[in-house]
């Protein structure tokens, strides 16, 4: 070790001395000596590494209390940070999907700070069932005989297969063997559930006779999977749920449909593309339907199974149900969300997902023009700003080929360099409330469909 390095190391104050610094003592009192000592130790290690690599002290060594405050703020920043979702994807899986309605937020808040009647029957003063209240609402809204709640739709499919067709064959069209995010495939779920997959038909065409010919004494379930994250078009044929349900009834076999997303309302009445509704499938004779809570439904992450009472009872009694069950916060949010559907006339304003999906393009255009006027002076000389029409997508595998007309504020670098755009996007992601846009065609696009706090965005981009 050189003499210069030894001199630099000797300038690093001991942690005990730093803890007695008048500017640091309040932080110790507020956050505890254990945490502050650990952060100071990290700073010392960082300083030692700088000396080792560059033969100098870090610039922040002139003010240890300030460096500690910055490290403390970084350490305490929540990993689930609120962001401005200007990506153009409303139900963005990586950004948490559906925003909860205010009644759902209030219900979760109430449940967090108090003991609740999760599994307590007030009438009989005994144990109740945690799914009961939500199941009753789902039965009212879908016409189902009963319902079961688990932690996501993949879990719903897994539980359904394991409880209804263990060790049996499950017949599915080859064109419906979907893969969802994270390389999670329907055939893999079937293997985990202990079922044997029987593919019928072809990728683009499957007929009722294909299902009929596959039925034997080992068949346990006839299943359809809604291809919610892709679309097969052209020379196609598929068996509808009513036909499959009739075939199942003829052979004494249950039928099930995995909707993936699923909607409890007719989206077409809001000017949106139609999405299969659980209640219509049940009315067509399907025995079990699975769908998600945090997609088009607009609630918390949950897997929902509705259908015949006897079949739901088998799901509730299966050992996997306890492993996959949801807690009080999910149930509180889901119950409050479902209650909004009892007032369909108000749903468009009360449910954030529906409100964002149905925003008229003129509203986003007006917002883009307002932002353009305010922000242009701040980026003059570096970026050209424009208000431009664009297309939003619903996201999370819902209506994959459908787009929603929207409007964006775009940023084009004056130097024409992609690196300049990347640097701008990186800087915005580092903001206290990160701004998430998308880079396309040499521009950074801020799709304004999901923007409901213009002033907050202006303040963030002006910082």
UniProtKB/Swiss-Prot annotation:
Listed InterPro entries: PyrdxlP-dep_Trfase (IPR015424), PyrdxlP-dep_Trfase_major (IPR015421), SelA-like (IPR018319), SelA_trans (IPR004534), SelA_trans_N_dom (IPR025862)
Enzyme class: transferase
An annotated GO BP: selenocysteine incorporation
Pathway given in the UniProt record: Aminoacyl-tRNA biosynthesis; selenocysteinyl-tRNA(Sec) biosynthesis; selenocysteinyl-tRNA(Sec) from L-seryl-tRNA(Sec) (bacterial route): step 1/1
Isomerase among keywords: no
Cellular location(s): Cytoplasm
Name of a matching Pfam family: SelA
Residue numbers carrying N6-(pyridoxal phosphate)lysine: 295
Keyword Transferase attributed: yes
EC number, UniProt record: 2.9.1.1
GO MF term set: L-seryl-tRNA(Sec) selenium transferase activity
GO cellular component: cytoplasm
Catalytic activity entry: L-seryl-tRNA(Sec) + selenophosphate + H(+) = L-selenocysteinyl-tRNA(Sec) + phosphate
Entry cofactors: pyridoxal 5'-phosphate
Swiss-Prot/TrEMBL keywords: Cytoplasm, Protein biosynthesis, Pyridoxal phosphate, Selenium, Transferase
Family recorded in the similarity comment: Belongs to the SelA family.
Role this protein plays: Converts seryl-tRNA(Sec) to selenocysteinyl-tRNA(Sec) required for selenoprotein biosynthesis.
Subunit structure: Homodecamer; pentamer of dimers. Binds only one seryl-tRNA(Sec) per dimer.
Name of the featured protein: L-seryl-tRNA(Sec) selenium transferase
Species, as recorded: Serratia proteamaculans (strain 568)
Organismal lineage: Bacteria, Pseudomonadati, Pseudomonadota, Gammaproteobacteria, Enterobacterales
Gene responsible for this protein: selA
